[in-house]
Amino acid sequence: MSFRFIYGRAGSGKSKFCIDDIEKRLQEDTNKQLILIVPEQFSFQAEKSVVEKVKGTGITNVKVTSFERIAYDVFNEVGGSTHKIINSSGKLMLIFNIINNLKDELKVFATAANQEGFVNNISDIITELKRYDVTATELRATLNLIEDEFLKDKINDISYIFEQFQESLHKNYIDSEDELTLLYRKIDTSKMFDGAEVWIDEFSSFTPQQYKILEKLMEKASRVNITLCMDYYRVIDGTDVFAPTKRTEEKLREILKEKDVKLDKPIILNNDDVNRFKDSSELKYLEENYFKYPYKPYDKTTDDIKIIRALNPYSEVENIAKEIAKISMESNIRYRDIAVITRDLEGYEKIVKTIFDEYEIPYFIDKKKEIDDNPLIVLITSVIEIFNKSWSYEAMFRYLKTGLSNVSKEEVDLLENYVLAYGIRGKKKWQSPWEYGNENILEKINEIRIKVSEPLIKFSSKLKGKSKADEICSAVYNFLCSIGVNETIEKWVYKFKNEGNQALAKEYSQIWNMVIELLDQVVEVFKEEELQLKDFVKILSLGFKDYKMGLIPPSLDQVLVSDVERVRTHEIKLLYIIGVNDGIFPAVSKDEGILSDSDRGSLKKIGIEIAEDTKSKAFEEQYLIYRTLTTTQKYLRICYSIADYEGKALRPSIIVSRFKSLFPKIAEESDNIAMDYEEENIDLISREIPTFNNLVSVLRREDNKVKVSPFWSDVYKWYSENPRWKETLDTVFSAISYTNAVDDISEEKIRKMYGNKLYLTVSRLEKYAQCPFGYYIKYGLKAKERKIFALTPPDLGTFMHNVIDEFSEVVDKSGFKWYEIEDKWCKDTVSEIVDRKAEESAGGIFTSSARYKYFTERLKRVLIKTILVIIEHLKRSGFQPIGHEVGFGNDEKYPPIEIELSSGEKVKLIGRIDRVDKLDMEKKDYYRIIDYKSGNKDFSLSDVYYGLQLQLLTYLDAILTNEELKDREEALPGGVLYLKIDDPIIKGKRNLSEEEIQDEIMKALKMKGLLLADEEVVKEMDRKIEGNSLIIPARINKDGSLGKSSVGTEEQFRLLREHVKKNLIKACEDMLKGDIKIRPIRSKNADACTYCLYSSICEFDTNFEDNEFKVVQEKKDEEVWELLRKEGEESWEK
């Protein structure tokens, strides 16, 4: 028995020496057992290297293995545990169950126990304790030695969970961490290592469990060889890059001394004859000097090493893709000789996929794929969520949209529209026939409902309350079979293979077996234990998140894309390290885990040694940098970004500054300067997709009259003559010349849309004034939003208007005068109307949930308050209602409002106004129009002038000019007013009396609008007016005169009405001309696009030449009156 160290820095040929040594031993004795032990992740590469080097029959005596495989082989030889090995998912499930049962007894972790990720954290610490050979008993024994009370409670919780885990585990299982412990006990009886020579390569450190196995190997093997990546002759302190390896050497020497193992003369590989860097003096210098202080800078220009500075990560990857594409065409470097590695593979993975696909670069991303976003996994968790969350819309359609539910996409879309429109929620509604909506689709909708609900109902019938774990798993399996999931997946796999998508085919061919394996694991762990569904779905989710799918490279000639920690090959000729930015590489360890650095230090002092703290990990990160920088044989590219995707500045890593110090003349490439399209830049020509993208940039520049090189004409010609690209090129041409301008529609089409007899509403003409295109989409094309089962502001407005209208009808029929109505009768009547209308609402939305029922009561309060205010208004006023919901139209009380266009054609305006009031005074009739508003609508003369508020003045004019209403000598305007429907909250600095509160409510609901500038008329509107009115926008000054704001003379009202008519005529004429321009109005406070539903259709963008707002400058009332006066004079002169 002997032991030999093999020393050498990175690239010195340690792995090569081991394989050569194995070949030499094999030639000396073909029967001798020769064993090479490497980390599990190195095993494939090591086996490949051994097979390539060692040939002949003796190869059968050479074994490449890992500690994990040794356990497997020894157990097969001498027998292992009688217990099954639980996988990591099963381990998480077991820990979840333990924590779930113990959480009330935990001191520190009681709250954290319910947090996502806590189970994984506990699993990690248990794994760590086992690997460092710390038992639960030993951990608990430290409690009396710990002074810090919080740490003591934390260790108490951990040891408690650890004890319960070990007890539960060892009843039936062992986990992967127990395997090495069992191997230590079993290896003595194995003959596998008897007389064998062992080489151990690629380890920088070992766990206490592995050290124990090494002790056994030293006892049984003829010789054990271990490689150590370090400089034998260098004095190494605790901060040196080789410090982790040095600590390993010291620990091994302690064991050798304790076991009295003979130490053979070490092998010291000389870096002067280094094999890996024989073709690059720059890389050899880098390996020797990167961590050397002081150092002598490399005084030559670098050819093999470059720094690439990019604008952002996307540009960073595109730069290397261009270079790889060029190198693959111009040199003998194959794709398999190239690696792209990063410390942030998650952040760069999607970018690499996108860009490498564009550049047609074959690649393999070396990572295990998570499965929790696979459609089958989503389906299973969603089905359980359906039952846990009362058949919620979200869970139901997450399930249906997986594509595995045996329901077509078209059926899912139809069903979703219906469910959203009518608020289908809950098992009861899914079981009952649906009867709302269009009868033409009800039969089809109910067929789909049954198709969806029947398997779910059958499934849920087997899961009531708590169910045994094996029963739940069996029900899940039977459900999946009942909807044909496995058959659908098989069809997908076949489809993916036919499409050449081997990666997806491989993923989906494994997923079914993975799910079955996980369900089996649940049954194994929980057996007949009863579980609630909410816990079952958590258990499943833990398992699904833990599962990782190993992928095999589909071809040999591919670029390797990997995390820096997973690069396992030394056959790389060109290495790109991307994301060399501050905080990314080297990584900054922030998460200390359940045990902080301080906790670990305290435990170490009392004899419990576990994994390194974050400070030690920082030194390990330095060693990782060393290993990474010395991976390549010939070329090295250090790549970093100066900004992220949002333009936020990023700093280069300390690695970049170190390179610039070592290599003062290092080449640094940058894409910060815009590409030159004027020169014949052949570098812009590469693969089809990226070259096409550059061509598009050229075409844009040409469109902007910027000079470009003539050679792009040849590029354009190639794409235009290529059948695969011609259509795409034409589309790009159209896009570049696109202005987003909308042409006028022909009169013929306009007539087909709106008909020859034009009936329009004033509110629609207001919409047209706001944006012609928006009007066209809504009323011409009749585009509709997807109907959602919810109360929208328009729904509420309509509901409240209807209640007030019906209340008005009841008042009229009862014979009451408004000023005679008592508060109690008002409240009872409103309440009864609201309740009845709520019951009659489509889909029963007002009674569909406790929230909506509460909202209905709130509506009652609002309406009662508003109607009581209306009653108070009318008690104070000489104006009394002569009509509610007054309609203008063929079948209405009053005929349509007729306007004549300049062509002689007549347009009929139809609609209704909420209320018309009249005052009889001295053979004159004064009329006022009142419009109820549930929002904060204010009257604006400026908006009236621009045609944005037309309704009140249009209806006032119709009333004043209607012959049927003129039973007196003269009909005059009294005013136009908005009345807000609300239940205002009154705030006061002191206790207010009931009368004061009432006054404050009246102020809050004061009507807004325009009144006739006549003191007597105003005083009739508010007979209690003193100073500022509580109910109308008017003021009586101390001298008895009328305030000037919000009033207009008879002449001004006439001019305003005339101007409104002109606005109506112009809007109608523009509409009939086919003007549907994208021309939204913009005013001081808002624009027409703010709440527009059709922005995704019009794609209005002021960057387009023809896309501009129609800006209206807000005008003061005085300015409007002056403009109207001038208009009137001009009309009179004509």
Curated annotation (Swiss-Prot):
Pfam family, one: ADDB_N
Gene designation: addB
Cofactor note: Binds 1 [4Fe-4S] cluster.
Protein family: Belongs to the helicase family. AddB/RexB type 1 subfamily.
Organism the protein comes from: Clostridium novyi (strain NT)
Quaternary organization: Heterodimer of AddA and AddB.
Binding of [4Fe-4S] cluster, residues: C771, C1089, C1092, C1098
UniProt-recorded name of the protein: ATP-dependent helicase/deoxyribonuclease subunit B
Role description: The heterodimer acts as both an ATP-dependent DNA helicase and an ATP-dependent, dual-direction single-stranded exonuclease. Recognizes the chi site generating a DNA molecule suitable for the initiation of homologous recombination. The AddB subunit has 5' -> 3' nuclease activity but not helicase activity.
EC assignment: 3.1.-.-
Keyword Heme: no
Example of a GO biological process term: double-strand break repair via homologous recombination
Keywords: 4Fe-4S, ATP-binding, DNA damage, DNA repair, DNA-binding, Exonuclease, Helicase, Hydrolase, Iron, Iron-sulfur, Metal-binding, Nuclease, Nucleotide-binding
One GO MF term attached to the UniProt entry: double-stranded DNA binding
